[in-house]
Amino acid sequence: MERKSELTKALLGEKFKDLVAKKGFEKLTIKMITDAAGVIRPTFYNYFQDKYEVMEWLLWEDVFKEVSELMEQERGMESLHLLFRKFGEDKTYYEKVFEVTGQNSFEEMLYRQVFHMEEILVKHHPLKHLKNMPHVDEKVFLEFHAISLVNGLKYWLIRESKNISAGDAMEFYQYMMSHSIMDLLDIENQEKKK
């Protein structure tokens, strides 16, 4: 019976994802989800409180369950590659859910998962450079980094996913995080021209 329950929950999640990709989140109703899944409306409420909970569950099931497992195995780079790949595989869906704003925004859900992923990473590999910056503690650093990753994913999906592959977006993200803009400015040549 438990297996059937898991299959029903997965079916509801799959139909939710398909419908969001086609119609968008705001126009989607619980009835539309249950009709697509071939179940009655009360069945939905056996698994989820509302469509926001489906969105959060899918983020965990489809992406962060596996990403977190890799993080726990101290395979940080693989987990980052997987994160970008998973978003790339379902980019139409993720473009649509990034439009969900307000109290239960997708962006906030994603931020919490990314922050947790980074906490796991730091648990295995403590930060070393914050000693020179006493006003920036580990939490502030991780929050800033999580915001950067979430916004990087959002920008890529909404603006550039048709032009930039998941692998290239991941490489670009790594490059941006390892170089400051000051490292990239051609200041020496500008000064020579003066």
Give each language-model segment a name:
Residues 77-92, 143, 147, 151:
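Amphipathic alpha-helical segments that line or abut small-molecule/effector binding pockets
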Residues 103-130, 136-154:
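Amphipathic alpha-helical packing segments from all-alpha helical-bundle domains
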Residues 38-48:
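Short hydrophobic/aromatic patch on the recognition helix
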Residues 158-194:
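C-terminal peripheral helix-coil segments that are non-catalytic and often amphipathic
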Residues 29, 43, 93:
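Residues in the helix-turn-helix
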Residues 1-23, 27, 32:
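Basic, helix-initiating cap at the start of DNA-binding domains
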Residues 10-18, 36, 53-73, 78-85, ...:
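Alpha-helical structural segments
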Residues 24-30, 51, 130-134:
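Short glycine/proline-centered loop/turn elements that form peptide/ligand docking sites
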